[in-house]
Regions:
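P-loop NTP-binding site
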Residues: 1-127
Length: 127
């Protein structure tokens, strides 16, 4: 439910972003009515690395958040999956724990447009 026209949009996908396409989205297409955005993303150029994207007002930052669990040695990963229910729940056979998960908060968000523009940043990659 939106109050005062402020709502949220959650973008969730498994495929990687192309870094150049995502950079173009952030630099040229990022909606002006987004107040805050935060979440995890990954790129075909660095498939083992998890990135944290944060935006507040005009400030935007993309920083390395370490490696995905999917990059762990198989025996360690198996133990981790047995212990961590959340990891097990979110696990994907192809992508492991890699995901695009961005939450946008803003006024009168065009959720469909945001998702379509971000979908244009996705690419196929063989892991």
């Amino acid at each position: 439910m939106e109050e005062y026209g402020i709502g949220t949009c959650v973008y969730y996908r498994r495929k990687p972003f192309d870094m150049n396409f995502f950079d173009n989205f952030v630099a040229r297409l990022f909606p002006k009515n987004v107040i805050r955005c935060k979440g995890l993303c990954w790129f075909k150029e660095e498939p083992d690395m998890c990135y944290l994207f944060e935006q507040a007002g005009k400030q935007m930052e993309l920083k390395n958040a370490g490696q995905w669990y999917a990059t762990m040695p198989k025996d360690e990963l198996q133990q981790m999956l047995e212990r961590e229910e959340g990891l097990r729940r979110d696990w994907d056979e192809k992508y492991g724990d890699r995901m695009q998960k961005l939450v946008f908060i803003g006024q009168k968000l065009d959720k469909k447009a945001i998702k379509e523009q971000l979908d244009m940043c996705l690419t196929d990659v063989e892991l």
